[in-house]
A protein has these predicted regions:
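Short gly/ser-rich loop at a beta-strand->alpha-helix junction or flexible surface loop bordering the NTP-binding
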Residues: 2-148, 152, 159-230
Length: 230
């Protein structure tokens, strides 16, 4: 297959998948691995992750690695046919979701995805968590399904993330209008004991304790001016 024909076939995917195509999608379109390798050597494609290639003319986004990891979960299926709760896919979550929401400063370069069933990966940079998500738990960022700020905070509390880190994420999420304090308090009661709150199930007490650790409170945060986000 000549170069122009191969690129034309691949463009059906790259034009609608952030400039990327999986090797399985390429094979299904009639472009084999040998041709992909030849296109890569010729400078038409870059290898993003194992089994995922990007057209070199496509602009890379800040979340290209996450996009590539998500594509690989259901590598044969085009992105435009997948739903946010794709049973064969997953949702960006936990630390990765906080990063995509631009919340907090958690240091973890791994890509974390929540999947409805157990998954494994040979890629040490990809980590899976198994959980059942609801539609209200998921939003979209740059075309990717990502857990909402509320669900992300709940997941991080379940992981026992350091209280100051989680409090900062909560503060920034509230300031960005991604999270309501009253709604959060209703959902985080189950994590109160593990953070040392003496009243089991008291989400408001847990929230107050977390915020006190970074020098603020529910009342202060609810009434403070919202700083600009850049």
């Amino acid at each position: 297959m000549n170069t122009s024909d191969a690129l034309r076939l691949l463009s059906a995917f790259t034009s609608a998948q952030w400039g990327m195509v999986t090797s399985r999608q390429a094979k299904g379109a009639g472009v084999d691995g040998v041709t992909l390798h030849r296109l890569e050597k010729a400078g038409h494609l870059d290898r993003v992750r194992h089994g995922v290639y990007a057209a070199t003319i496509a602009a890379a986004t800040e979340v290209r690695e996450e996009q590539a990891a998500w594509l690989m979960l259901n590598a044969a299926e085009p992105a435009w046919k997948r739903t946010p709760l794709d049973p064969d896919g997953g949702v960006i979550s936990h630390e990765s979701a906080a990063r995509l929401h631009r919340l907090g400063e958690l240091v973890d370069d791994r890509i974390v995805l929540t999947t409805p069933r157990r998954r494994t990966s040979r890629d040490p940079d990809v980590c899976f968590r198994v959980a059942g998500l609801l539609e209200d738990d998921v939003t979209t960022i740059d075309g990717l399904p990502v857990t909402t700020a509320l669900r992300t905070v709940r997941d991080l509390l379940a992981q026992r993330i350091d209280s100051s880190h989680i409090a900062t994420i909560i503060q920034e999420a509230v300031e960005a209008n991604l999270l309501r304090l009253d709604v959060l308090a209703e959902h985080i009661g189950p994590y109160a004991l593990r953070y040392g709150v003496r009243r089991p199930g008291d989400g408001e007490a847990l929230l107050e304790q977390l915020l006190a650790g970074i020098g603020t409170s529910i009342t202060q945060l609810a009434h403070r001016p919202t700083p600009p986000r850049y």
